[in-house]
Amino acid sequence: PSMSKDEILDSLFGWKGKKVVLWMPTFRKSDLGGCAENEIELPCQLPAIQDMNELKELDSYLREQEIILIIKKHPLQTEWDENEQEFTNIRYVAEALLEKKQIKLYELIGISDGLLSDYSSVAVDYLLLDRPLGYVLADYNIYKEKRGFVFEDPLEYMPGEKIYNACDIRKFMKHLTDGTDSYRQERAKNLKQMHNKTENYCKRLADYLQL
């Protein structure tokens, strides 16, 4: 059976709190040659964060609000030591830790109360949960220049708060705790565009497999 929210948090961090936010930034630095993303420089390997002081201030705010921010490292991301767990309410996880604890990535996604993403397809998957989304777009222009997007205007497909700095991250957290959800209708609209059929998954799969 799947682990409960409290069981997963206790297994990973020995932590319980009011809210869980998962941050899944796409990679900017990797060992893959020829990747345009490798030219994007970020001080803390996180968009919207200028330095460690901002992370410390954010950690303090999260502690006051009893929120844990779990930053999931992209498998291709380099120059990032997620083993340095120097914060109380900002915690890093990578594939190795999840495997060690026998926790699937989508179990972690499933227990989160909100998701911070950017240009990653995980935000499309998250629409199925109908929970608040934040899009961290601090390097939007340079990412568009170096990597490019599939859609002509990707912002049309981002039904959530647009985040450009640490202050915006705190606003997202505040809205999450006080129940402010201004993008519910936009998420529903995007859900219909991105997920053609969203009902009776098990029955349709069983019918397809002729069970």
Residue ranges, per PLM feature:
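Conserved catalytic-core segment of nucleotide-activated headgroup transferases in glycan assembly
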Residues: 1-86, 199-202
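Short, charged, surface-exposed secondary-structure boundary motifs
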Residues: 1, 101-106, 144-151
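Alpha-helical elements of Rossmann-like donor-binding domains used by nucleotide-donor carbohydrate transfer enzymes
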Residues: 7, 57, 168-171, 204, ...
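Generic beta-sheet signal
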Residues: 72, 95, 136-138
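Donor nucleotide-activated moiety binding/catalytic core segment of transferases
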Residues: 75-124
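Catalytic binding pocket for nucleotide-activated donors in carbohydrate/polymer assembly enzymes
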Residues: 88, 121-194
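C-terminal alpha-helical cap of glycosyltransferases
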Residues: 197-211
